[in-house]
Amino acid sequence: MRLLEIVRSDATGNDVIASAFALAKKIRKIGVLSKVCFGFIGNRMMDPYAREAQRLVLEGATPAQVDSALENFGMAMGILAVFDMAGVDVGVKVRKANPQQGSSDPSFYRADAVLFGQNWIGQKTGKGYYRYEQGSRERHPHPEAQALLAEEAKKLGIAQRTDITEQEIVERCIYSMINEGAKILEEGVALRPGDIDVVYTSGYGFPRRRGGPMFFADEIGLSTVLAGIEKYGKRLHAEDWQPAPLLKKLAAENGTFAAWHAARSKKG
């Protein structure tokens, strides 16, 4: 990974920031400045993205179906395969240590919790969202996991669907990521939309041909993104689909994140 997120607190001096960027250049990393928040830029935006992927498998999509849709969009690796590679247990422990970052939706990251309960934590145990042969990273279907997730969905009152499309998978995962990015911009955690795009194209496998999540949002139109967020918010957990105020404002003005940043820069 070439990305190096450089995190600035209120007490961090400019000389320290300059030294950090110089170090990034020396070790051939791409430095991006972030303010302090849970997950900084990259992991904070990955949280809703992965939330939707996990919810989709509870609704009846297979892990391969979810990951294939994201990889066809251009992501370097589907998010469920990423969890298997990193370890399902890592995310479970992070959420346990930071319960305030959760949701009132009982399905929130339940897929991870179910797999963790079976010690199916990914490649290091040979089973996770997928099954792996010893010494291999090749993904194979894991029917036991899918059956257990279907049982969990039934307990949660989540109906199994057969009509989940590739378009829905991409929209739910990518639009929720963009929405979080808009919140990050408005809070000043990231200085500019381009910084978010660099984080995602340099460190999180977002397709360079699409420019990054915020550039992609500008390209397809913020009104399109907002309409999708509002649509899914009506039939999913509304709390998790609240549109970012900045996204609503710019969509109403037929604006873009890039133009918003340019206007702010001119004001100094």
Locate each region found by the language model.
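N-terminal glycine-rich phosphate-binding loop for ADP-containing cofactors
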Residues: M1-G268
